[in-house]
């Protein structure tokens, strides 16, 4: 568990990790279980290439959520590479969604769905940045 000097759980860190775990579990579940529906709803089209890439991304998200769950029990010491990886994934995906919005080119999907995903990924990116700066001496 993540502790401060008095050996109490730092609530903000527990909140941020919990949000990130739920975020990755939600998207991995959507990508792995509802691959077809998720691709149609969020990408706008479906074929086997999209399904394969969606499943790979779901596996990556599931792995990251499991890693964060393990960190809840083992601690965050020396886990900076994992948190930088999580931040980069969230940030790059959110920037990609914002690019679709700013250029008004949703492709086969709609701007509302892309906007929701952009906001979710941006929010989680900001939380991860906050977590990294809040714990930089432990990472």
Positions of PLM-derived features:
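Hydrophobic transmembrane helix segments
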Residues: 19-59
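Non-cytosolic membrane-interface motifs at loop->transmembrane helix junctions
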Residues: 42-49, 106-118
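Core segments of alpha-helical transmembrane spans in multipass integral membrane proteins
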Residues: 50-72, 88-95
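Alpha-helical transmembrane segments of polytopic membrane proteins
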Residues: 51-60, 112-122
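Hydrophobic alpha-helical membrane segments
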Residues: 82-101, 118-125
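Membrane-helix boundary connector in multi-pass membrane proteins
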Residues: 95-115, 134
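Membrane-water interface at the C-terminal end of transmembrane alpha helices
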Residues: 120-139
């Amino acid at each position: 568990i993540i502790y401060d000097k008095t050996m109490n759980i730092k609530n903000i860190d527990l909140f941020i990790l919990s949000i990130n775990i739920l975020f990755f579990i939600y998207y991995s579940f959507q990508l792995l279980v509802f691959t077809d529906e998720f691709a149609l709803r969020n990408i706008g089209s479906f074929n086997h290439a999209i399904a394969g890439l969606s499943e790979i991304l779901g596996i990556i998200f599931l792995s990251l959520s499991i890693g964060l769950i393990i960190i809840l029990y083992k601690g965050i010491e020396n886990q900076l590479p994992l948190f930088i990886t999580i931040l980069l994934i969230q940030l790059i995906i959110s920037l990609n969604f914002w690019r679709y919005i700013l250029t008004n080119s949703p492709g086969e999907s709609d701007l509302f769905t892309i906007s929701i995903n952009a906001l979710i990924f941006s929010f989680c990116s900001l939380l991860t940045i906050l977590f990294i700066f809040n714990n930089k001496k432990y990472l």
